[in-house]
Amino acid sequence: MLDNVLRIATRQSPLALWQAQYVKQRLEACHPGLTVELVPMVTRGDVILDTPLAKVGGKGLFVKELELAMLDGRADIAVHSMKDVPVEFPEGLGLVTICEREDPRDAFVSNQYKSLDEMPAGSIVGTSSLRRQCQIAARRPDLIIRSLRGNVGTRLSKLDNGDYDAIILAVAGLKRLQLDARITSPLAPEISLPAVGQGAVGIECRLDDTRTRELLAPLNHEETAVRVRAERAMNTRLEGGCQVPIGSYAELRDGELWLRALVGAPDGSRIVRGERRGAPEDARQLGISLAEELLNHGAREILADVYQGDGPA
């Protein structure tokens, strides 16, 4: 980084810019005299909007350009929605800070119906997520699920134009964009288990950049980091990309870590669920052991079908 200037690589969507501004304000508050600049970029994920993410490389499309900017020195850090962060990082880069988590639940958004269960048969629900799709299809196989891409504003416009009867979005994104009023009802984890890391903001940087890592340290929220560590360890063992039907949600209750997870067939015909409880310091192992349980109870076959025969070992 330059003397007293830190540069954040960010996508240009309203939500990405909110996250970058949030980190900028936190850093400048923690370190008077530090100037934080945004380096807005367009990623492939922002350009390819006419195809479901699962068919064009998953959500890693949203981070590759940001990582290149850090590797070639145009930026010092990148700010990500944790649910978009792939399992593996390019050599020399890593996730060093996880900020405090916002509400991780999914949101049911509709101008006509109060809840998913109230929708009549044949209603159209919009989502681009296989995870959401499989859980909705399992609960309401009589609904029609259609792909929905674009930023939050674009998705809401499609709902308002009548293209869909309801759409599913993340509560956290709507809250951050001050669109809380659009949330018809949050979906309990029992109905729609969130994505790995959903609601959390993560910061990636060059691992050898000691000064930047020191500046970022005060932004780390340990409880969130522990919860996300368990969720990501499970996802890593499942070899889950960001566009596979995997849900995972960890909570800390009375000093104990409670991790729930599922792997589902995209059409909702089969869902394998499991849970584990343990000590927070064992978060990573908890995630791995739960993944092993899921794999042994049918998740391996489901994922092999999703990956067209190339599932986890």
Swiss-Prot record:
It catalyses: 4 porphobilinogen + H2O = hydroxymethylbilane + 4 NH4(+). The modification S-(dipyrrolylmethanemethyl)cysteine is found at residue 242. Its EC number is 2.5.1.61. Binds 1 dipyrromethane group covalently. Its cofactor is dipyrromethane. Belongs to the HMBS family. Monomer. This is Porphobilinogen deaminase.
